Amino acid sequence: MENTVQNKPIIELRSITKSYGSNTIIKDFNLTINNGEFLTILGPSGCGKTTVLRLLAGLEELDSGNIILDGEDITNVPAEKRHVNTVFQSYALFPHMTIFENVAFGLRMQKVPEAEIKPRVLEALRMVQLEEMADRKPTQLSGGQQQRIAIARAVVNKPKVLLLDESLSALDYKLRKQMQYELKVLQRQLGITFIFVTHDQEEAITMSDRIVLLRKGKIAQDGSPREIYEEPANLFVARFIGEINVFDATVIERKSENVVLANVEGRVCDIYTDIPVKKDQQLQVLLRPEDIVIKELDEHEHSKAIIGHIIDRTYKGMTLESTVEFEQNGKRGLVSEFFNEDDPHMDHSIGQRVGITWHEGWEVVLNDEDNQ
């Protein structure tokens, strides 16, 4: 069954607070998660993302607040009685049991009739394409196969929500990319809510319907992967999600409701923003490396671009990255271009004088956080 994200809430976290001793991890935290959603809780170490997951699973007790699952208050419901299952980073498979017995374990703990266990286990193994591995032991499987068994063991219980705690971090790069795709497909097939916890922004952007980015126990931004990447709400979000250039800008004048004339690192140009501004106000102009264009200049040419010299070039297969040091102040900008060996305009050299520009309207403009 193809999954379509519904707007009906499946989980509501209402003003939850959790402390360890005198250290408050999250305080008055609110979050609504919709039915059938693939939601990723993303953030650096210590931001509170794993604490939120453990509270959802019932592995930690709240100090205050409420957790609502499908309309029912489960704040005081023990972990084993919640319709929630967790796939841990370690997978936590029993090495002495066969794959079949590992997947069947939860059903036996719930005293499900034996006649019902076999078809449900085989169906779960079929979903993760490991039905033929039923009689093997976990040590006979690869890391990716163990990951899928851990997921099968969780979904066989027919949970309303599946929690995944950094469960791809132990895999190598190629297998991790494969499992990202497989998890997304499986979630759509099952039609249940996945809540994935990670510090890896690429995983979050690749897999999620929605990302909640945490910082010090608070939500820094909540939105779709595209919104988070292209429209960061603040400098922390912009820097956490991929590479970003942060240029200093000084307001010259407002030209219209959405256009401001500004001096950006020596380049006088239009920037697009509806932020209230006044003359000489400091702003920050954010641009992804792939949104910047290099223009070749001779040593005496003046341009409406930011002028600088190329100080480093890095070939990355599909792209070519150039670091440009600005003549005006010695700051540096990063430019990423799709590599085309037949394009003479890409043949820049170390030390070459260049100008950098961008497509007007592609920039993100924020108030200068250093001067607030």
Swiss-Prot record:
Gene3D superfamilies: 2.40.50.100, P-loop containing nucleotide triphosphate hydrolases. Residues 11-241 form the ABC transporter domain. The keyword DNA-binding does not apply. It is an enzyme of class 7 (translocase). GO terms for cellular component: ATP-binding cassette (ABC) transporter complex. Pfam families: ABC_tran, TOBE_2. Keywords: ATP-binding, Cell inner membrane, Cell membrane, Membrane, Nucleotide-binding, Translocase, Transport. ATP binds at G43, P44, S45, G46, C47, G48, K49, T50. Its EC number is 7.6.2.11. It is found in: Cell inner membrane. InterPro entries: AAA+_ATPase (IPR003593), ABC_SmlMolc_Importer (IPR050093), ABC_transporter-like_ATP-bd (IPR003439), ABC_transporter-like_CS (IPR017871), Mo/tungstate-bd_C_term_dom (IPR008995), P-loop_NTPase (IPR027417), PotA-like (IPR005893), PotA_ATP-bd (IPR017879). It is a peripheral membrane protein. It comes from the Bacteria. The keyword Iron does not apply. It catalyses: ATP + H2O + polyamine-[polyamine-binding protein]Side 1 = ADP + phosphate + polyamineSide 2 + [polyamine-binding protein]Side 1. GO terms for molecular function: ABC-type putrescine transporter activity; ATP binding; ATP hydrolysis activity. Belongs to the ABC transporter superfamily. Spermidine/putrescine importer (TC 3.A.1.11.1) family. The complex is composed of two ATP-binding proteins (PotA), two transmembrane proteins (PotB and PotC) and a solute-binding protein (PotD). Part of the ABC transporter complex PotABCD involved in spermidine/putrescine import. Responsible for energy coupling to the transport system. This is Spermidine/putrescine import ATP-binding protein PotA. It comes from Aggregatibacter actinomycetemcomitans.
